[in-house]
Amino acid sequence: MAVTMRQMLEAGVHFGHQTRFWNPKMAPFIFGHRNKIHIINLEKTLPMFTDAQKYVRQLAANRGTILFVGTKRQSRDTIAQEAQRAGMPYVNARWLGGMMTNFKTLKVSIKRLKDMEAAVESGETEKMSKKEALLFEREIAKLQKSIGGVKDMGGIPDAIFVVDVGYHKIAVTEANKLGVPVIAVVDTNHSPEGVDYVIPGNDDSSKAVALYAEGVADAILEGRANAVNEVVQAARGDDEYVEENA
């Protein structure tokens, strides 16, 4: 479903940071300021968000993987929830350096986590001593928190969706190094450089974060649904062609 200007206003997408903290590279997206707070121009944000959704829709239709990244307290739960709804991987605890540029190491940790989860399911942990079980529980909890969201990613994603580029500059840098497209929310205190699909907007409000994440997840689900419909229609077309020539 398309996001409207009214929804953006209600979510506070237009509220930037204090004027003294601004990044001049965001000047083209700033409408003005009120009470020493920059006001983002939603007439710029809305079409740019729509473009980002269009790209995401196409990527999802081609079975692409989009990694959701949002580790700030106010975005953690929403990022996990919307990524899961869209069937996409996510990082919502801490970005571990090398998550993309050193994917081989991440794969080792993922294997360890999956082996541990399998041990729990098979009842293997019941044979452990109290101390062993406690250490096991601590390790599996730590792994689930840090990499649980990417355990089924399978490889480097086709794009990343980031809320707050300043807070996640390592993730953006890694994506840039690998040529992975970056879709990101950029507030008035950060630079849009290194971002392929810039969404100028408030990156602190939980309502605004929910609007972005839901919009991206919706676009993914729409892209997948469109791809399925095309396959069904193509199959029907083939059947009709066979009938005509029978």
Curated annotation (Swiss-Prot):
UniProt keyword list: Ribonucleoprotein, Ribosomal protein
InterPro entries linked to this entry: Ribosomal_uS2, Ribosomal_uS2_bac/mit/plastid, Ribosomal_uS2_CS, Ribosomal_uS2_flav_dom_sf
Gene Ontology cellular-component terms listed: cytosolic small ribosomal subunit
Gene3D superfamilies: Glucose-6-phosphate isomerase like protein, domain 1, Helix hairpin bin
Keyword Iron listed: no
Protein's GO biological process: translation
Keyword Electron transport: no
GO molecular function: structural constituent of ribosome
Superkingdom: Bacteria
SUPFAM superfamilies in the record: Ribosomal protein S2
Family label: Belongs to the universal ribosomal protein uS2 family.
HAMAP family linked to this entry: Ribosomal_uS2_B
UniProt name for this protein: Small ribosomal subunit protein uS2
Originating organism: Burkholderia cenocepacia (strain HI2424)
